[in-house]
Amino acid sequence: MRILQLSDPHLVAADAALVRERPAMTLLDRALLEGQRSHPDLVLISGDLCQDESWGGYVRLGRLLDRHVNVPVGLLPGNHDDPLLLKAVLGRRFCTAPAELIVQGTRLVLLNSHRSGCSAGWLGPHQLQWLQERLADPLRRDLPLVVALHHPPVAIGHPVMDTMNLSDHHQLAAILQPHAALRAVVFGHIHQHWHGTWPQRPDVPLLGCPSTLRSFQCVQPCPLGRAEDPGGRLLEIHNDGSLSHQVLRWSPC
């Protein structure tokens, strides 16, 4: 089962508008087109979907997804999002966090780390309790598990981004680390490739995703040597339950 992860498109209501000096809509359109070459079974966009948190921005996101994608879609809110508006506009057609998806025997749990008025992330006690109850389901607990959220669940070594990661990351780690079926935790927010682990679970990769819009100063070298290009990530759960992953990059024009 293949998951195409894209992140941080920062769309706005105006089709041709520049965001951070780049054409956000055109770049996400390109990312979806390039990503389909990998033949994913699910598309995940891990937050900061709509820079201006507008109805029009989410409508345009839906149109792009309808144009390019014919597999299940998971959408995560980031700090540059309005989770309620996202759900109102796109929640009937696509899966919005918090939610659980099972695709071809793989379990994907989507978390909402948005906290109103704050750049840092927060899951909160109610969502953490929901997560704990979901993971305890005896009928599903042995399925390969991928957990996705917008904010990094660990410090990545970046002086700015580490001030706005997930504030309740210790509570999340305490819930996730005991689960033998956990294969990966994936996130956005940092606009760059990043690969780390928890010391307690060195077998579980913690994976940051490049942005479809533009990159921030990188902590780790890009495996493809293209740190400035838009990109994404492809994850594959194999028939034996093992996971492989790779960074994807493409030209911005």
UniProtKB/Swiss-Prot annotation:
Enzyme Commission code: 3.1.4.-
Residues given in the record as AMP binding sites: H10, D48, N79, H80, H191
UniProt cross-references to Pfam families, sorted A to Z: Metallophos
InterPro entries (alphabetical): Calcineurin-like_PHP_ApaH (IPR004843), CNP_phosphodiesterase-III (IPR050884), Metallo-depent_PP-like (IPR029052)
Residues engaged in binding Fe cation 1: D8, H10, D48, H191
Broadest EC class assigned to this enzyme: hydrolase
Residues bound to Fe cation 2: D48, N79, H150, H189
Cofactor: Fe(2+)
Gene Ontology MF, one: 3',5'-cyclic-AMP phosphodiesterase activity
Keyword Transferase on entry: no
Cofactor note: Binds 2 Fe(2+) ions per subunit.
Family according to the record: Belongs to the cyclic nucleotide phosphodiesterase class-III family.
Protein name: Probable cyclic nucleotide phosphodiesterase SYNW0868
Species, as recorded: Parasynechococcus marenigrum (strain WH8102)
